[in-house]
Amino acid sequence: SAFSPVLVVGKKKELRQPVKIKAVNWHHKKRPVELQVGNFPPERYVLTPGINNIETSIPEVTAPCELPIILKEQGKAVSKINEKATPVKKWTVYLVQHTHTDIGYTKPQTEILSEHLRYIDYAIEYCEQTKDYTDDAKFRWTCESAWAVDEYLKNRPEEQVNKLKKYIAKGQIEVASMYFNMSEIVDESSFKTFLQPVKEFRKHGIPSTLAMQNDVNGIAWCLADYLPDLGIKYLWMGEHHYKSQVPFNMPTVFQWESPSGKPILTYRADHYNTGNFWGIEQGDIQKTEPKLLHYLSELERKHYPFDAVGIQYSGYFTDNSPPSIIECKLIREWNEKYAYPKLRSATASEFLDYITKRYGDKIPAYRAAYPDWWTDGFGSAARETAASRKTHSDMTAVEGLLSMAVLKDKCLPQTTHQRIEHIHESLLFYDEHTFGASESVSDPLCENSQVQWGEKSAYAWEAVKRTQMLYETSVGLLQGDLRRGKNPTLTIFNTLNWKRSEMLTVYIDFEVIPRNQFFEITDFQGHSLKVQPIRYRREGCYYAIFAEDIPPMGYKTFEIVFKQPSTDTGTITINNASIENHFYKLQLNPDKGTIQSLYDKELNCELVDSSSPWELGAFIYEKLGNRDQLAQYRLDDYNR
């Protein structure tokens, strides 16, 4: 359309809509012409040979209409077109500058922290540098991850910390509450460490009412319960669209309800670098304008319901980007040129405050999980990822054992709480979303790829090592109170709050149960547990034991009783490659090491799909012909 989707301020301070046309002068000399739009007074121009870009304006259009655009020469029309003019939506674009926090990716992890502390110093400087800018253009910055601010408070002098507090109080710097951008492998209990900085911030008088998750297309549902309890009003989700899909077809504000019904106002934003897709960091309106206006027109086409939109960008088009004031200058220049759309340098909460105030009664509510499928790098490190997940579970048990010790009036070692925090912090550093250096796919053996993986994996193994030692501490506190008998004893703990009967694996030295010695594990009433040896070491054996009725937040002690061998051979029969009991019949393929058949006798049902080209348990090695197909949600160039 010739009618530009912006509004400018006329000479009489009235709003006007620009009209832009291209006129071609085929003559070799200049031609004086008149341009008339609708019934508005004509304006005079001189066309030079070739293509001429002509820009005029008309009073603001308040309803859709079709207007003729006529080019006249010596009073006669030489060209005429009819163009549809529509009212310009009076947009405000809240531009939210942030630094996306990758622990690694652009540089090794050990270099990232010092950079992010420096960025907070820069942000303070830029607040000072833009103090005389118009309010819309003043530097504002949302600190995406609480980790950087938490470390800043520990590593900067009081004078510098006070400057940070000053600009937080003025609303130019905002501190988000979440430690990192998290994957889904972290468990619920670790979020107490994850959200711990909020408490520290409040000790310093620093408010935190926003949670921000970027570059991860989902988030743990338990946070919808936890965040409101901490006084956090808003959740901002900066998506990533590459080889993934996101909920909703446009930016969406909604009340996200937890399983218990607690709401938190949530914004599903577009990509966390959307402003950079427009080239905003280049500071050139001519480059940014068409992309920005196209974006807004697409929102209108999709019936976006608000007159404001929150857009994220970084100072430069990269992760772990330093902040910048280039964009502040562009915002100032834009607002001097256009009345609408209006650009505003803003914090994330400022945008959501506006939406809440103006549209609060029109915001939908959803009670549903918000799962992620973007942080798939963990699949490339099954060993370390399994170690992390197991350690989360182990820490639940260890903390339960320590709680039992406290309930028994045991005195915990002074360093216990520090050790717990260190373990959870190590797990968070492994579980946060960053996986691999930026060149880890194109050059997996380069120094940066190797160094970053070494540091990433070390977090998981550090947590494993320290958890095992903390387990020894907790058991050491309790072992003096455990029941003993004339025979060796085995105590099984249940650190959860319900009675449990489960199978567990126990390692027992040959000094306790000699090799080839027949035995039973019984309670003190003579009831035996089911026990099966799994694998042997030179000095002992691992046993599978089915423990029954272990009391909640308690334990049960059993005796190891030696006995003569039984003549009962059991009810399992093994014939060639077939294993069978009362419940199942399992047929193996010894050539492939797979399962051909698994028949459920109770259900009278075959559980293995015999029509599948791969048997159950088969190893499938798949190679992609190209990675680009992932971004297009298709899979047609591969071999298996």
Summary of predicted features, one role per range:
Residues 77-117, 138, 227, 575-588:
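An acidic-aromatic substrate-binding cleft motif
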Residues 183-203, 275-300, 633-636:
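Alpha-helical scaffold elements lining the catalytic groove of polysaccharide deacetylases
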Residues 103, 134-139, 143-214, 262-271:
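Metal-dependent polysaccharide deacetylase catalytic core of the NodB/CE4 family, i.e.
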Residues 92-94, 99-102, 250-481, 495, ...:
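Active-site and substrate-binding clefts of carbohydrate-active enzymes
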Residues 417, 421, 429-640:
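Catalytic and substrate-binding regions of extracellular carbohydrate-active enzymes
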Residues 163-170, 220-283:
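Surface-exposed loop and adjacent secondary-structure segments within mature catalytic domains
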Residues 191-229, 294-313:
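CE4/NodB-like, metal-dependent polysaccharide N-deacetylase domain
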